[in-house]
Amino acid sequence: MLLLPLLLLAGRFPGGDNEDALQGPTSYHVMQISSFTNSTWTENRGSGWLEDLQIHRWDSETGTAIFLKPWSKGNLSDEEITELVELFRVYFFGLVRELRDHVTEFQMK
């Protein structure tokens, strides 16, 4: 989702190291690890990777995204970033609720 704004940003400022930015496919990956320590405590960790460079991470304690590079927000406004962070919060909350509702089916205790 953030890949397109990053590529557009690179395209707007050609020259230097940015010349090759649009020449080949670029991958953006999101990794998530959820730890269910007991029936009441869950920790979610996440990271966003542009090729082999980590540009985001998820802070489970504060429930927000940490941007590791000054340019990693792309061309998104603060309002759009807030909406994306809220979307991830809802996702993590829903995932935890669904897994807890079906814990007996997964044979986890």
Curated annotation (Swiss-Prot):
Residues 1-18 form the signal peptide. It comes from the Eukaryota. GO terms for biological process: adaptive immune response. The keyword Cell cycle does not apply. SUPFAM superfamilies: MHC antigen-recognition domain (SSF54452). Glycans are attached at N38, N75. It is a single-pass type I membrane protein. Its main location: membrane. It is found in: Cell membrane; Endosome membrane; Lysosome membrane. GO terms for cellular component: endosome membrane; lysosomal membrane; plasma membrane. Keywords: Adaptive immunity, Cell membrane, Endosome, Glycoprotein, Immunity, Immunoglobulin domain, Lysosome, Membrane, Signal. The keyword Nucleotide-binding does not apply. Expressed on cortical thymocytes, on certain T-cell leukemias, and in various other tissues. During protein synthesis and maturation, CD1 family members bind endogenous lipids that are replaced by lipid or glycolipid antigens when the proteins are internalized and pass through endosomes or lysosomes, before trafficking back to the cell surface. Interaction with saposin C is required for the loading of bacterial lipid antigens onto CD1B in the lysosome. Heterodimer with B2M (beta-2-microglobulin). Interacts with saposin C. Antigen-presenting protein that binds self and non-self lipid and glycolipid antigens and presents them to T-cell receptors on natural killer T-cells. This is T-cell surface glycoprotein CD1b.
